[in-house]
Swiss-Prot record:
One of its GO terms (cellular component) is nucleus. Its EC number is 2.1.1.-. Keywords: Methylation, Methyltransferase, Nucleus, Phosphoprotein, S-adenosyl-L-methionine, Transferase. GO terms for molecular function: NF-kappaB binding; protein-lysine N-methyltransferase activity; S-adenosyl-L-methionine binding. S-adenosyl-L-methionine binds at residues 74-76, 224, 252-253, 298. The modification Phosphoserine is found at residue 14. The lineage of its organism: Eukaryota, Metazoa, Chordata, Craniata, Vertebrata. PANTHER family: N-LYSINE METHYLTRANSFERASE SETD6, UNCHARACTERIZED PUTATIVE METHYLTRANSFERASE. Belongs to the class V-like SAM-binding methyltransferase superfamily. Histone-lysine methyltransferase family. SETD6 subfamily. It is an enzyme of class 2 (transferase). Automethylated. Protein-lysine N-methyltransferase. Monomethylates 'Lys-310' of the RELA subunit of NF-kappa-B complex, leading to down-regulation of NF-kappa-B transcription factor activity. Monomethylates 'Lys-8' of H2AZ (H2AZK8me1). Required for the maintenance of embryonic stem cell self-renewal. Methylates PAK4. This is N-lysine methyltransferase SETD6. It catalyses: L-lysyl-[protein] + S-adenosyl-L-methionine = N(6)-methyl-L-lysyl-[protein] + S-adenosyl-L-homocysteine + H(+); L-lysyl(8)-[histone H2AZ] + S-adenosyl-L-methionine = N(6)-methyl-L-lysyl(8)-[histone H2AZ] + S-adenosyl-L-homocysteine + H(+). The gene is Setd6.
Length: 474
């Protein structure tokens, strides 16, 4: 289930604009308990029903764990009844209990129509399986659906009013990612999903033929589903399709997690990775996720400074703009554009790409180092470099773009990097001091809405990384 540690070098940051990324487990926010999209069920009844269902399907829960809303960071979670040691099994989910296109009641149909259901996201078969099972009164997964959050109250930014999304998340990269998601979801629904449901109207009631419900289920799959990793010898294959893993998606996330999902032929097992004290919550990981990714895909952010995987982006075009600002005449501008075009042809930069800066390192080190080098090198050196297309060129020394080594960079590199950071900071609606004032005043912070608090954590974490870069390049 772990996410890739680094983003693609040239990425549009949208999980639905390309083949399906690694989905993770669920983001948890305090929401009323539903029984799927059609009704409500008291919490104790829902948990009891789910536990009875676990027994029926052979999902084995350790007696040391408890499914509960009490003692969790948000919503449902899993808590240790007794102390747990590393390596202990927390629960085991038989593959027959997984909800996927291969296990649902219309699996044969989905397999026959597989060619017609292909999409950029790769999620359509699972989403159709969910749409069918949700409407079925006797669905084998009904007790599992009872633990889902209320679909109409998901907190992903795609459900925020556009004005609120822009106001709270401007500069973070989230509004742009959401807009791409919404365009792709709408296209996928009307071109593939709705025609399929209408062609099989006996299997899909009018109540589930809804773009809004489809959008909600996309958010659910984005947040709750898992994707089994390929074996090393299968690296050239297409990624595995996402699937729903009951019990595993109950666990909440923190960067310093204490459990991990393991895959085997018959079972998926959640195993403790570090000691868990009695009464403490059991946490899985969604991978190395920056706060902007967490809020985009799951609807929450980790409070500063807890997310050690947090990052800030410097748009590649911002570096180009900063370099252009340093030119003095048209000749210099044309020469700089020539260098940029060279970098584009080398696939090191792109119009929608970003340089990703972590707390301790530059995650896109090769791309940023080469870009700074090419844009700052003397004209004659660039001509030689271009003729060789970079072949045989000595690479930047290992670790030269570790955050602590940035002061050692050439002055021209530091100046360009600093100017790029300043341009990036201008894209936010507020400055760092405004965020610090909100965070330091507990009374004021407590009065903020959930969305305002989460967005503040995203903005603040990014700005702290960017301001540290300013200090190191001064």
């Amino acid at each position: 289930m772990a996410a890739p540690a680094k983003r693609a070098r040239v990425s549009d940051a949208s999980p639905l604009a390309a083949p399906c990324p690694v989905p993770r487990a669920a983001a948890r926010v305090p929401l009323p308990l539903p029984a799927g999209p059609s009704g409500h069920e008291p919490e104790s009844d829902a948990v009891a029903g789910f536990l009875r269902w676990c027994t029926r399907v052979g999902l084995e829960l350790s007696p040391k764990v408890l499914v509960s809303r009490q003692g969790t960071v948000a919503g449902y979670g899993m808590v240790a009844r007794e102390s747990v040691q590393p390596g202990e099994l927390l629960f085991a989910v038989p593959r027959s209990a997984l909800l996927s296109p291969h296990t649902c009641s219309i699996s044969d149909l989905l397999e026959r129509e597989r060619g017609a259901l292909q999409s950029l996201s790769g999620w359509v078969p699972l989403l159709l399986a969910l749409l069918h099972e949700l409407q079925a009164p006797a669905s084998p997964w009904s007790p599992y659906f009872a633990l889902w959050p209320e679909l109409g109250r998901l907190e992903h930014p795609m459900f925020w009013p556009e004005e609120e999304r822009l106001r709270l998340l401007k500069g973070t990269g989230v509004p742009e990612a959401v807009e791409k998601d919404l365009v792709n979801i709408r296209s996928e629904y009307y071109s593939i999903v709705l025609p399929f449901m209408e062609a099989h109207s006996d299997l899909f009631s009018p109540t589930v033929r809804s773009l809004e419900l489809y959008r909600q289920l996309v958010a659910l799959v984005m947040a709750y589903s898992f994707q089994e990793p390929l074996e090393e010898e299968e690296d050239e294959k297409e990624p595995n399709s996402p699937l729903m893993v009951p019990a595993a998606d109950i666990l909440n996330h923190i960067a310093n997690h204490n459990a991990n999902l393991e895959y085997s032929a018959e079972y998926l097992r959640m195993v403790a990775t570090q000691p868990i004290l009695k009464g403490h919550e059991i946490f899985n990981t969604y991978g190395q996720m920056a706060n902007w990714q967490l809020i985009h895909m799951y609807g929450f952010a980790e409070p500063y400074p807890n997310n050690t995987d947090d990052t800030a982006d410097i748009q590649m075009v911002a570096v180009r703009e900063a370099a252009l600002q340093g030119t003095e005449d048209e000749t210099e501008r044309l020469l700089l554009c020539e260098r940029w075009d060279f970098l584009c042809k080398q696939e090191l930069v792109g119009e929608e790409g970003a340089f990703v800066i972590g707390r301790e390192e530059v995650l896109t080190e090769e791309e940023l180092a080469t870009t700074l080098k090419v844009l700052c090198m003397p004209a004659e050196e660039f001509r030689d470099y271009k003729e060789r297309a970079g072949w045989g060129e000595e690479e930047t020394e290992d670790g030269s773009l570790a955050i602590t080594n940035i002061p050692k960079l050439q002055e021209s590199w530091k100046r360009l990097l600093r100017d790029s950071v300043l341009l990036t900071l201008q894209t936010y609606a507020t400055d760092l001091k405004t965020e610090q004032d909100l965070l330091s005043n507990k009374e004021v912070y407590a009065k903020l809405s959930w969305r305002e608090q989460q967005a503040l954590q995203v903005r603040y974490g990014q700005k702290m990384i960017l301001h540290r870069l300013l200090e190191l390049t001064s």
